[in-house]
Amino acid sequence: MNPGAILVFENFIEKDLINKTLEEIKNYDWKPVWANKRYAGDFWMTCPLIEDFTKTPNFNTFALAKVIEEKMQCKIVNLMFYAMLPGGNIPPHRDMVGNVGFGGLRLHVPIITNPKVNFVVARKRVIMSTGELWALDTSYTHSVSNYGEENRIHLVMDVIVNDWVLKLLPPKNIKFYLHQFHLILLGFLKFFKYFTSKDLKLKDFLHVVYNSIKLKLFKK
């Protein structure tokens, strides 16, 4: 089992609703995920439905959005369509928005895909089929490339982990806690590297931290 990508339901969304969604989204004016085109440039596009818990004007355009809202027994932070165009590539990376240990999880529902999509999580290729529901822990290294000739469109949601969400996932085991420890260690090393690269002496940094804490504790 891949700890970073877990198949939750095989038939989460019916084919008729998938086809309806493809018709509804056909004329949407896609926007780049990153305005500065940091990842994949114009090859990675988005259609936001919920942003920071708030529905966008796009939400009521799609019947699928309402179905998802009814199905999910948890808080949805973000809900969006992501389109990876042919030739698009997002290099290996990790982020904490979907780290179960930090209280978040990212869920994917493929709307349209093709056999030449190469989605890799924790160094293992993950093949997602249309209509399935997948849980992705984004704290594991992941990447995606679309070598096919069709767009790869997923409905993606960031949710807050609660008891209902936890029941969708395998029980936490020693590997889970070792992974969290690994992330903390990586964060510490990155933190340390940042300050040493700025020629900031450790004792000076600790002095700044001490004064900041003292200020917060004793300010009136």
What are these regions (language model features)?
Residues L105-P110, L133-A135, E149-K167:
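A short hydrophobic beta-strand segment most commonly corresponding to one strand
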